[in-house]
Curated annotation (Swiss-Prot):
Segments crossing the lipid bilayer: 4-24
PANTHER family according to UniProt: SEC-INDEPENDENT PROTEIN TRANSLOCASE PROTEIN TATA
Family per record: Belongs to the TatA/E family.
UniProt name for this protein: Sec-independent protein translocase protein TatA
Function: Part of the twin-arginine translocation (Tat) system that transports large folded proteins containing a characteristic twin-arginine motif in their signal peptide across membranes. TatA could form the protein-conducting channel of the Tat system.
Pfam families: TatA_B_E (PF02416)
Domain of life of the native organism: Bacteria
Alphabetic keyword roster: Cell inner membrane, Cell membrane, Membrane, Protein transport, Translocation, Transmembrane, Transmembrane helix, Transport
Organism: Gluconobacter oxydans (strain 621H)
Region (Disordered): 46-84
Length: 84
């Protein structure tokens, strides 16, 4: 009971690192973390506004496929017939 276990030594080491060397680094990390959360929330709000804009478009509107006038699709049997 009187001796310190490895868990106690680990906690003591972390506390000493924070007190003597990591105070500024930890506050910087927390600031970066907060900026990341704010950016995430902002982007989520932007996505929701884009979804609302998409929902206002006509529900039956389907854009036509791209038409390439210089391209004709041929099957492999047609190609084989043309080569023989």
């Amino acid at each position: 009971m009187g001796s310190m276990s490895p868990v106690h030594w680990l906690i003591l080491a972390v506390v000493l690192l924070v007190v003597f060397g990591g105070g500024g680094k930890i506050s910087g990390l927390m600031g970066d973390f907060a900026k990341g959360i704010k950016s995430f929330k902002k982007n989520m709000a932007d996505d929701e506004s884009m979804t609302a804009t998409d929902a206002t478009q006509a529900p039956g509107h389907i854009s036509p496929p791209n038409q390439n006038p210089g391209y004709s699709q041929t099957t492999s049997s047609e190609t084989h017939r043309n080569q023989v």
